[in-house]
Curated annotation (Swiss-Prot):
<keyword id="KW-1003">Cell membrane</keyword>
<keyword id="KW-0067">ATP-binding</keyword>
<keyword id="KW-0406">Ion transport</keyword>
<keyword id="KW-0547">Nucleotide-binding</keyword>
<dbReference type="InterPro" id="IPR005294">
    <property type="entry name" value="ATP_synth_F1_asu"/>
</dbReference>
<dbReference type="Pfam" id="PF00006">
    <property type="entry name" value="ATP-synt_ab"/>
</dbReference>
<dbReference type="InterPro" id="IPR033732">
    <property type="entry name" value="ATP_synth_F1_a_nt-bd_dom"/>
</dbReference>
<dbReference type="InterPro" id="IPR036121">
    <property type="entry name" value="ATPase_F1/V1/A1_a/bsu_N_sf"/>
</dbReference>
<dbReference type="InterPro" id="IPR020003">
    <property type="entry name" value="ATPase_a/bsu_AS"/>
</dbReference>
<dbReference type="InterPro" id="IPR000194">
    <property type="entry name" value="ATPase_F1/V1/A1_a/bsu_nucl-bd"/>
</dbReference>
<keyword id="KW-0813">Transport</keyword>
<dbReference type="Pfam" id="PF00306">
    <property type="entry name" value="ATP-synt_ab_C"/>
</dbReference>
<feature type="site" description="Required for activity">
    <location>
        <position position="375"/>
    </location>
</feature>
<keyword id="KW-0139">CF(1)</keyword>
<dbReference type="InterPro" id="IPR000793">
    <property type="entry name" value="ATP_synth_asu_C"/>
</dbReference>
<dbReference type="GO" id="GO:0043531">
    <property type="term" value="F:ADP binding"/>
</dbReference>
<dbReference type="GO" id="GO:0045259">
    <property type="term" value="C:proton-transporting ATP synthase complex"/>
</dbReference>
Length: 543
């Protein structure tokens, strides 16, 4: 028998050849988990030890889920969509991705769900320019620019007293049925003139996020925007009341992601969250089902962070990031005008001001029902045009004094002349600020209207004649003078413009006829010219 010999060099060569020729198997590996329990839009999943927070998971029927709770033995998953087909024992797989949404100009004019899928039956969305994650970071302090450009709402009561600037967060708050959504829709419609100008610096893309509303309400909003020609530059992200809590929770972040794409490309965006009370309630139900510790009013402890990280994404960014802006109009519903409740106080502290709508004013036909005393804009004043700032300087103070004097006058039997004049001026200003829905004013029309009211040109009118007088005056000035054009082009209200406006108002007053059929200015007989003629006849007769 031959002796066995082992050559170390041969062994080394054989190992090297094997390593160099080795190819791993093409068979993919995946972590697979299983549904332990499921119900109420929540699933508890075992397995998946490598799952990340906020990672997307897929169930057997293709439904997506969001990894919300990462516990030692299981994962709490928020189901995004219909959860009727998810049962115990089904497989769950990781995607390795966090939740994101497609973005681009293809979304203009469309109605989509919180995952970016179309709901309007108009086919697939074209013009997709990429994807953006929902939980994107807000711009940091050094990349923000001060708010210095106005965003006109077309509503006299807001643009004059609580102005909004591009990049601002302005809360609209009030009881149900006080006109909160109407203000937001009017603001969107008012951007039509800017859009039709074709100037990218003026154009504003609008996003309306409907959270927990009736499907019929969302359809009505869409129809109103279409009738006004505003859907051309608007995207609706819809999560109606029938949707799962997970969809209502992520809907505002979907809208923000779509808007941030435009903002970082140097464009201007207006986003409406209608309303954040519903999102907070959806987040509360998710947290309670996942057995997170409840806090005040059973909301979880991080409900403030829920809204702060959302609203901080609204900003005017520096030129280094494109110089775009995203203006936020969050809406919060109160109960019995209680602004000191948990969610209202949270959002008030996050935003740059609030427009408080009073149910008593709304029921008294004062619409928009803006409460002057509580409403405030903390940064919008810097963005107000010079013309509007000049004429509206005393408006808010006059109305606030009128409100306090009005309540005092209810108990006073006799008032001095100054108090009566103040009450008269306040009543006429209040009437002047009434405005029907879907009838926005241009900034130059607002300047003329507010100047007319604050300078006492309406004080001798009956209250029912104030709005007809205003409409007639605006038509008269538009057709007979260049005042509106001058204010629009210069954005200033000079002494010459004011003198021309004063003259035009007096001319129109001489032609205005009240609802009672009486002229506002009585024409006096020309006695001074008639007297000398009579005297000459007398002298001629004597001769």
């Amino acid at each position: 028998m031959a002796e066995l010999t082992i050559d170390p060099a041969s062994i080394r060569k054989a190992l090297d050849d094997f390593v160099s020729s080795y190819k791993p198997s093409d068979t993919p590996t995946q972590e697979v988990g299983y549904v332990a329990t499921a119900g109420d839009g929540i699933a508890h999943v075992t397995g998946l030890p490598g799952c990340m927070a906020n990672e997307l998971l897929t169930f057997e029927d293709g439904t997506l889920g969001l990894a919300f709770n990462l516990d030692a033995r299981e994962i709490g998953v928020v189901i995004l969509g219909d959860f009727a087909g998810i049962e115990e024992g089904q497989e769950v797989r990781r995607t390795g991705e966090v939740l994101s949404v497609p973005v681009g100009d293809g979304y203009l004019g469309r109605v989509v769900d919180p995952l970016g899928k179309p709901l309007d039956g108009l086919g697939e969305i074209q013009g997709i320019e990429g994807r953006r994650i929902l939980e994107a970071q807000a711009p940091d302090v050094m990349h923000r620019h001060p708010v210095d450009e106005p965003l006109s709402t077309g509503l006299k009561a807001i643009d004059a007293m609580t102005p909004i600037g591009r990049g601002q967060r302005q809360l609209i708050i009030g009881d149900r049925q006080t006109g909160k959504t109407a203000i937001a829709i009017d603001t969107i419609i008012n951007q039509k003139a800017n859009w039709e100008s074709g100037d990218p610096k003026k154009q504003v893309r609008c996003i309306y996020v409907a959270i927990g509303q009736k499907g019929s309400t969302i359809a009505s909003v869409k129809q109103s925007l279409e009738d006004a020609g505003a859907m051309e530059y608007t995207t609706i992200v819809a999560s109606p009341a029938a949707d799962s809590a997970g969809f209502k929770y992520i809907a505002p972040y979907t809208g923000s992601a779509i808007g941030q794409h435009w903002m970082y490309n140097g464009k201007h965006v207006l986003i409406v969250f209608d309303d954040l009370s519903k999102q907070a309630e959806a987040y509360r139900s998710i947290s309670l089902l996942l057995r997170r510790p409840p806090g005040r009013e059973a909301y979880p402890g991080d409900v403030f962070y829920l809204h702060s990280r959302l609203l901080e994404r609204c900003a005017k960014v520096s030129d280094d990031l494109g110089g775009g802006s995203m203006t936020g109009l969050p809406i919060v519903e109160t109960k019995a005008n209680d602004v000191s409740a948990y969610i209202p106080t949270n959002v008030i502290s996050i935003t740059d001001g609030q427009i408080f709508l009073q149910s008593d004013l709304f029921n008294a036909n004062q619409r928009p029902a803006v409460d002057v005393g509580i409403s405030v804009s903390r940064v919008g004043g810097a963005a107000q045009t010079k013309a509007l700032k000049k004429v509206s300087g005393t408006l808010k103070i006059s109305l606030a004094q009128y409100r306090s004097l009005e309540s005092f006058a209810m108990f006073a039997s006799d008032l001095d002349a100054a108090s009566k004049a103040q009450l008269t001026r306040g009543a006429h200003l209040t009437e002047l600020l009434k405005q029907p829905q879907f009838h926005p004013y241009s900034p130059e029309q607002e300047v003329v209207s507010v100047w007319t009211g604050t300078h006492g040109k309406l004080d001798d009118l009956d209250l029912k004649d104030v709005l007809p007088f205003e409409q007639g005056l605006l038509d008269y000035i538009d057709h007979n003078t260049d005042i509106l054009k001058t204010i629009r082009e210069t954005e200033e209200f000079t002494a010459d413009t004011e003198a021309a406006l004063d003259k035009a108002v007096d001319e129109f007053r001489s032609t205005f006829v009240s609802s009672a059929g009486k002229p506002l200015v009585e024409k006096k007989p020309d006695v001074d010219k008639a007297a000398p003629v009579d005297q000459e006849k007398i002298v001629a007769g004597e001769k």
